[in-house]
Amino acid sequence: MSNSPTNMPMRDLLQAGAHFGHQTRFWNPKMNQYIFGARNKIHIINLEHTVKAFNEALTYVNGLAAKNNKVLFVGTKRAASGVIREQALRAGQPYVDHRWLGGMLTNWKTLRQSINRLKELEKQAEDGTFAKLTKREALERTRAMEKLERSLGGIKNMGGLPDAIFVVDVDHEAIAIKEAKNLGIPVIGIVDTNSNPDNVDYIIPANDDAIRAVTLYVTRMADAIIAGKEYAKTQAGGAAEAPAAEDVQTEEAAAPEADSAE
């Protein structure tokens, strides 16, 4: 795998099976420009398009992370949910891995009330409040907390609307994409040959079902974000050190003046 966080090698995509699309009879004509051909009635994706699109998307999220912006990872189907949660947590980004609740973006103010309730219940569980309740009351609150955690746990620390969303399987996550577009939030999407690329700002033509391929996509996206955050830290450190160097020069320049004054 390439060391560059904003470069997706074609070899990695080939090995992961990213070029295998869906059966030809299920294709979406809007994806025609990204299709190389067909083999055994399976569409083959032109990975030259995939590499170019992926590198553009990686560069974009890398830049967002360098500005301390947030990218919401979205993948609720079985092939994606596990790695979405794992890599989003590794990159310190919000995620939705269970089910997209209508209004997660467009009704954020109302949703924030549920998030506050979740945090309140978590605090009660930690500070011993649950232990003071009857078994039935404690069980009810525990179940309520677990339900909220499953639905909202990945976005409870998002703090506001994300600056972009990254989606695995754009058809499966159509509601999330629609909400993002309504709010002008850029969408990065893995788009298979059977999917509709409309409303996706960064179209990455690739297989969206193979677990190995999905793991590759999400991991590389997280890598690019982590690299962007590290770059921001380096820049912040350099900026903090610069005044200190100037102070030293000022002190050195002032020393002869003090001597001449004597």
Swiss-Prot record:
Q: Which GO terms describe its molecular function?
A: structural constituent of ribosome
PANTHER family in UniProt = 30S RIBOSOMAL PROTEIN S2 PROKARYOTIC AND ORGANELLAR, SMALL RIBOSOMAL SUBUNIT PROTEIN US2M
Which CDD domains does this chain map to? RPS2
This protein is called Small ribosomal subunit protein uS2
InterPro entries attached here?
Ribosomal_uS2 (IPR001865), Ribosomal_uS2_bac/mit/plastid (IPR005706), Ribosomal_uS2_CS (IPR018130), Ribosomal_uS2_flav_dom_sf (IPR023591)
GO cellular component terms, A-Z? cytosolic small ribosomal subunit
| Database matches in HAMAP family | Ribosomal_uS2_B (MF_00291_B)
- Region described as Disordered: spans on this chain: 236-262
